[in-house]
Amino acid sequence: GDVWLDYGFPQNIVDEVEDHADTILEQGTSLLSFGGDHFVTYPLLRSHSKIHGPISLIHFDAHSDTWEDDGDRIDHGSMFLRAAREGIVVPEKSVQIGIRTQNNCTHGFNILHAPWIHSHGVQEVNKFVHDIVKPGDPVYITFDVDCLDPAFAPGTGTPVVGGLSTAQALGILHSLGDLNLIGMDIVEVAPAYDHAEITSLAAATIGHDYLCLLAKKEGAQERIIGTKLDEKQIGPTKV
């Protein structure tokens, strides 16, 4: 359920979120979290790493979130650098997808910029990810909705044009089902900025399809992601 936070003491947020996640993960289950500010991923990663060890991070975003800081900030722009320095995530086995803002240092993360994705296509993205992340690596997915182009997700705090479409994002997500998925979060949805609620629909669909991937790994049938079609059913229908 929801994490109870005392907004008068923001310095306690990391421990409060981490402790709440611990109580769920200790039951041997998986966690899908929704935010909120992207910083929430940091305590979630801390909790998951207690069980799974160093993590391969698959990070959908317009921003790298690896800016240098003084080590004391609670900030959504630097938490992945902190996670890497603490050994929570392994940059060399992690991939950042959809980046289209400037950061002069990768800090070892593998980056797929949005323009590259547009020119090479989803299949090349999937190949790149599987060359970096191996089936046995514990994989955590974090999806900042501003990875999507504002045409598909206007309801977010820091939109950047030139992003992925929902079709591209879902195509990449669906390819990750053969990896060792340990958890996911979907963050930075701001419904007040989107009266048509297409951002919320995109986030809900991404979360739904992630759960379908988990269910499929547990032995469910093809109908989980979509009905399995006979070859005769694929393509245009003659009237």
Where are these regions (language model features)?
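Conserved alpha-helical scaffold segments that buttress catalytic/binding sites
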Residues: 1-239
